[in-house]
Every structure is written in C-alpha cells, then in structure tokens.
Amino acid sequence: EVTKVDAKVLKDMEDTMKEHNGIGISAIQIGHPIRVFLAGSPPQVFINPTILERSSYTKVDWEGCLSCPGAHVRVRRSHSIKVKYTNEEGIVIKRKFKGFDARVIQHEFDHLNGFLITDRGKVYQE
C-alpha cells in the first residue's frame, strides 16, 4: 500500500499524460510499480484506489491507451462506480463517478491490476 507519493513522480505522470494528450495515466506506465493513477481534466490523483460498487448497467465504447499506441478497443464498463481512494493531501475520499469519468477510472484501475485494453476486447489498429 502506498503511503506517500513523491511529487516528482506525480509531475512526471502529469507531464507524460499531457504530452500524449491522455486523459489518464497510471504510475506503472512510467515505470513506478505503485497503486497510483491520475484521471480527468484537470487530473485528479488516486492513491490506493478501490472500486467499492459497480452498476449492473454497462456500456460498450471505444478506448485507446498510452501503453498501446494506435490500438482502439471496444470495452464494456460499468456506467457508474463508487471509488474509495486517497488524494495527494492524504485525505481518504469515497465518491461516485458515472459515464466517461467512470470509464477512465476503470481503465486506469485495470493498469494497477495488470490489465490492458488489449486484454478486454478485439483490437483495431490505426
């Protein structure tokens, strides 16, 4: 479990995400095997996230990934989720997300558990 995240790691994550026009990035994608990701615009920090609830209503949509350049995959995700995480100030938060935000968070959460979009569906290459 992560207790403190180096500010330089967070800056490197944010810079990499912006450089590649991403909407999320996990620490593992830049070589830091810790349970941390950024998601959204402006990016929010998610430390030790846990998905507490997932809606039974799901939706399939296209996803891309900084780890799979040029690949696009149709992925089924829950439309709404409830997440528990710690922010960069060390505050534990429980919050619901839906739609696109929920999709991005589930995508980044997958990275923390060793999954890529290519594990979730048929790959369409650009």
Stretches with model-predicted labels:
Residues 1-126:
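Positively charged
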